Amino acid sequence: MIIAQYTRARLVQYGFYARIEGIEFDPRNGVRFCFRMRQEQIRDWGRENLSGRQYGDLKAALRVADVAIQACVANGKVDVSKSVFPARGCVDIKANDAVAKVATQVREQLGLLLPLLEADCHRLYEAGQNVHGTREIALGDVRVTLTEEPCGDFDFGWSPQPGDTLDDLLGGGRYLNLRIRVFRAGRLIAEKVRKGVVDTGNSPHYGGIGRALLREAITINAA
C-alpha cells in the first residue's frame, strides 16, 4: 500500500524521483520514508525548478509525510526528531498505528466490494445490456462507482450482440472511457480512467479489467 502514490507519481512525472526515493505505507510494517535530501533542500529545489502547480504538489507530498509521521509519534510508536529527512538513507517507522488501521479497513472493504461489482456487471452482460451511465456499490463508509463514458463510434451498420466474437466486431463498434472512483466517508480517495476501450456489449470491461483498474487505483491517503 502506498500512502503517497498519487503525489509520488506526480513527482516521477516531473523528474523529481531521482531526488526522492519515495514515501511508502504498508499496513503490516508501518511507514517508510526514503529521501536523499533534507526537507528544506527539497523545498528549495522545487521552488527553483518546478512550476507553481508542480511545487504545490511537492509541498503536498511533504505534508503527507509530516501527517503520517505525526500520527506515529502521537501513538508513541516511534521517537522522531525534527530532522526526519536525512541527507542520505531513510527513516523507518514500524507501527500498527491509527493510519495503518484506517488503510487496512478500507482495503478489507474493497476486497468485499470488488467481486460484488464484477458480479453486478456480469448480470448486465447476461441480460444483453451495458452499464449505460454509472453503477454504484457500497459497504460501510466505502463506496465504489463505475462510469461508462461513450467517447466515439465507428459504424458498421448493426449493433453488437452478446456472444459476438472479436471477428464479428472487426467492422466497427463503440469506444468507451471507463472511470472508476473510490470514496471513503464521501471523500474521493482513488480514481482511475481507461480510455478508448472497445465496447462489445458483453466483454468483461467492468469486471476483470475494472477490478484490475480498481486495484491499481487504490491510492489512499489514510492520514
Please place each PLM-identified region on the residue numbering.
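Acidic interaction surfaces
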Residues: M1-A223
